[in-house]
Amino acid sequence: MNHTRDIPQTFWRDDRLPWLELRSTWRSRQAYKRHSHPQLSVGAIIEGETRCLCAGQEYLLQPGDLIVIPPHAPHSCNPLHDRPRSYHMLYLDATWCRAQRPDIPPGASITSPQPLLRDSPLFASFQQVVALMCRGSLEQLPARLALLLHALPLCAAAPQAPHHASALLFQRLAMDLPASPSLDKLAHDSALRKETVIRAVKQDTGLTPASLINMARIEYAKTRLRAGDPIADVGYQAGFADQSHFHKTFVSYTAATPRQYAQSRSISDNK
């Protein structure tokens, strides 16, 4: 397996389009832990093959394929037989997506009845978006992305009320992320056995409480890295015990180092 720090990859974003991020990764064998994103994620396989587990289904992705991953859907996309693969990932803010799709009302969950897409014109449209971002053509991006979004098989679903153990965990994470509750504390405060808490949270989110806490910390760390905070401070801000723990956890859930993520390129850099 190649070292994460040596993998050629770039994160493109711009403060003028805060609802958009593009990741481009080349010839990577780096695996992911099961994770989720608050954004709608759309991936394109450029070379190699990827095994994608998403919402309990397995998909074998090949060059020219697109994969649509709804917000908060648990997934992992890993190399096949430890062979390198290259891919782009678009991350689109869920609120922005709803605003572009009148068929998905505010507050509704975004789902995709057909995650795997083998559609050459749609793949070409995705590649055009990537090309615009790499050229720094900022003005054309919103309209082009809206067209792409309208072509994706998305639909609305009523949000499901979480189990009270999950709701309690969400509340504690929002109140004090660095002091996230232990499983013992969560079980005590929800008056449930630890096994019941794990089962309830996993049923609601597809992740264990420990993974959910790690993901919340990673997402917070990403916001601080995007804001330009020093890497040495971000791990502590997010609640990690030390820099080693922060680095290892960040890599395992994002397949990138904190430094790679922090050293992003603005969409307008190439102008």
Residues covered by each model-derived region:
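Residues that scaffold the ATP/ADP-binding catalytic core of kinase and kinase-like folds
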Residues: 53, 99-101, 212, 234, ...
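Terminal helix-turn-helix DNA-binding modules in bacterial transcription factors
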Residues: 175, 184, 202-247, 263-271
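Short hydrophobic/aromatic patch on the recognition helix
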Residues: 64, 197, 201, 245-246, ...
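Short coil turns linking two alpha-helices in DNA-binding domains
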Residues: 189, 193-194, 241-242
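N-terminal regulatory/effector-sensing and dimerization cores
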Residues: 9-107
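Compact structured core domains
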Residues: 81-160, 166
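A short, Lys/Arg-enriched amphipathic alpha-helix from helix-turn-helix/homeodomain DNA-binding modules
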Residues: 117-130, 142, 153-190, 211-229
